[in-house]
């Protein structure tokens, strides 16, 4: 039997981290078994589904590189199929037309609640022999079995049982002729030969209804696995107040897809004590039996740690392809400066996100209008004039422009003037970067370049001279 899973989001908003984790688990399970992964867009909610949301879901899946083997399928393009199946069920007696008015149903609901009963349809039209005109508005309901129970072996939670007496007759077609969500899902899973349905625990109550419909259609019943919810670090349901919840917001905030995937796979699943997983290792080790039943707590600090790890361990050339987008957002022209892969190596150790790198690198490519006020006040003082003049001349004299030779020039300046390295390095750092902090000074100066470094030192010397003039 070929394993076939699906990810079936409703396009009413962005792809959130909970949905992304479900997609990842479904994708990994299919890949682990050499199976296929289907993308299905469940857009039956015509009022809330939007093209923008569909695009956002696709963007998120593509950014995470969770490529699908089939699809995307759209439920709105399959309405004829759904209605044909409903018509067949009406003929077979496994579905029936319901003419009850909204007013009657509301009164029934209020009466049941007043009596402390669970609100449910009472089956009036199921047993009715009244004649109705062909054009009289009606819905179609599934004739749910009235005895026995539905038992399914959830691959994460174990056996789950529902009494059929607790399940009312589900509406499968509305008065406007459109099929309902729970019915469309059943026909889709049947037609697409889905063998394993991996989805959120909020779908557990839908499962017995869907199984009963599948059995009424003499269709195979897939295996089900329901993943627990994701909470914030305070134990409450994850929401925007806990930070970003959209997958693409994490892209915008400077996270690598490898970091988010690694974090999400561990958010409810484990393989021993291992924390870092390549994509290949995720595929090899993933199993539903190792997925926890308990809710997971989202910890942004842990995700940030993983992101920093991947920035510094993935090939710099690859990280640079993701950095490019952030550089463009900052409107930085990188033609006159270090290659982005070199920039990753320069700033990756200090910066934990790609956005931080992009916001920290402008001085490598563009001239800054002024020095950081605090750094200049502390380090661009008259006492720094001689160290800057000497190191400028030594840098200008370098023939083979390497970081090692830059380091020698800085060290030689300190030795010649018989001062500590800080007396040379700190004013030099402010001079060439405009700020008081940077990566190691030798590699920073090397990346900025000889002529640009010399020009900036001269600018710093002019700043010191002007400062002296104001003091006198």
Swiss-Prot record:
Reaction catalysis annotation: tRNA(Glu) + L-glutamate + ATP = L-glutamyl-tRNA(Glu) + AMP + diphosphate
Cofactor(s), names only, from the UniProt record: Zn(2+)
Keyword ATP-binding appears in the UniProt entry: yes
EC number: 6.1.1.17
Methyltransferase recorded as keyword: no
Lineage top rank: taxon: Bacteria
Gene3D superfamilies attached to this UniProt entry: 1.10.10.350, HUPs
A GO term for molecular function: ATP binding
Amino acids binding ATP: 240
Renumbered ranges of motif 'HIGH' region: 9-19
GO CC terms in record: cytosol
Record-listed Zn(2+) binding positions: 98, 100, 125, 127
CDD domains assigned to the protein according to its UniProt record, in alphabetical order: GluRS_core
Gene Ontology terms describing biological process: glutamyl-tRNA aminoacylation
Pfam families attached to this UniProt entry: Anticodon_2 (PF19269), tRNA-synt_1c (PF00749)
Main location: cytoplasm
Cofactor binding annotation: Binds 1 zinc ion per subunit.
Record's subcellular location: Cytoplasm
Function according to Swiss-Prot or TrEMBL: Catalyzes the attachment of glutamate to tRNA(Glu) in a two-step reaction: glutamate is first activated by ATP to form Glu-AMP and then transferred to the acceptor end of tRNA(Glu).
PANTHER family: GLUTAMATE--TRNA LIGASE, GLUTAMATE--TRNA LIGASE, MITOCHONDRIAL-RELATED
NCBIfam families in alphabetical order: gltX_bact (TIGR00464)
Quaternary structure and partners: Monomer.
Family named by the database record: Belongs to the class-I aminoacyl-tRNA synthetase family. Glutamate--tRNA ligase type 1 subfamily.
The protein's name: Glutamate--tRNA ligase
Organism per entry: Klebsiella pneumoniae (strain 342)
């Amino acid at each position: 039997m070929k394993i076939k899973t699906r990810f079936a989001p409703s396009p009413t908003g962005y792809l959130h981290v909970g949905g992304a984790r479900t997609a990842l688990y479904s994708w990994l399970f299919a890949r682990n078994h050499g199976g296929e992964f289907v993308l299905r867009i469940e857009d039956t909610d015509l009022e809330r589904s939007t093209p923008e949301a569909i695009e956002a879901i696709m963007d998120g899946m593509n950014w995470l590189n969770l490529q699908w083997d089939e699809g995307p399928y759209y439920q709105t393009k399959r309405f004829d199929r759904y209605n044909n199946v409903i018509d067949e069920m009406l003929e077979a007696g496994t579905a029936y037309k319901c003419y009850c008015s909204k007013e009657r149903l509301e009164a029934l609901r209020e009466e049941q609640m007043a009596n402390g009963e669970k609100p449910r349809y009472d089956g009036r039209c199921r047993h009715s022999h009244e004649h109705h005109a062909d054009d009289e508005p009606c819905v179609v309901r599934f004739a749910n079995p009235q005895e026995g129970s539905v038992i399914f072996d959830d691959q994460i939670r174990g056996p789950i049982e529902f009494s059929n007496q607790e399940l009312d007759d589900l509406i499968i077609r509305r008065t406007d002729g459109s099929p309902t969500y729970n019915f469309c899902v059943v026909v889709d899973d049947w037609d697409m030969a889905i063998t394993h349905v991996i989805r959120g625990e909020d779908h557990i109550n839908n499962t017995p209804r869907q199984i009963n419909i599948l059995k009424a259609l003499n269709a195979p019943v897939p295996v089900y696995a329901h993943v627990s919810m994701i909470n914030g670090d305070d134990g409450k349901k994850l929401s925007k107040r806990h930070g970003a919840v959209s997958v693409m917001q994490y892209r915008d905030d400077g996270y690598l897809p490898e970091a988010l995937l690694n974090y999400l796979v561990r958010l409810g699943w484990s393989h021993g004590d291992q924390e870092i997983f390549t994509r290949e290792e995720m595929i090899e080790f993933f199993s539903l039996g190792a997925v926890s039943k308990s809710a997971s707590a989202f910890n942004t600090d842990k995700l940030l740690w993983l992101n920093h790890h991947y920035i510094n361990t993935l090939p710099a050339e690859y990280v640079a392809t993701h950095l490019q987008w952030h550089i463009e957002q900052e409107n930085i022209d990188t033609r006159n400066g270090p290659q982005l892969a070199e920039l990753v190596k320069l700033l990756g150790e200090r910066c934990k996100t790609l956005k931080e790198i992009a916001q920290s690198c402008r001085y490598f490519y563009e001239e800054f209008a002024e020095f950081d006020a605090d750094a200049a006040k502390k380090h661009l003082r008259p006492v720094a004039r001689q160290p800057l003049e000497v190191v400028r001349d030594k840098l200008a004299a370098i023939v083979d422009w390497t970081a090692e030779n830059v380091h020698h020039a800085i060290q030689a300046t300190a030795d010649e003037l018989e001062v500590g390295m800080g007396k040379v390095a700190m004013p030099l750092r402010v001079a060439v970067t405009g700020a008081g902090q940077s990566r190691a000074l030798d590699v920073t100066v090397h990346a900025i370049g000889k002529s640009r470094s010399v020009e900036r030192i001269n600018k710093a010397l002019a700043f010191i001279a002007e400062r002296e003039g104001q003091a006198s």
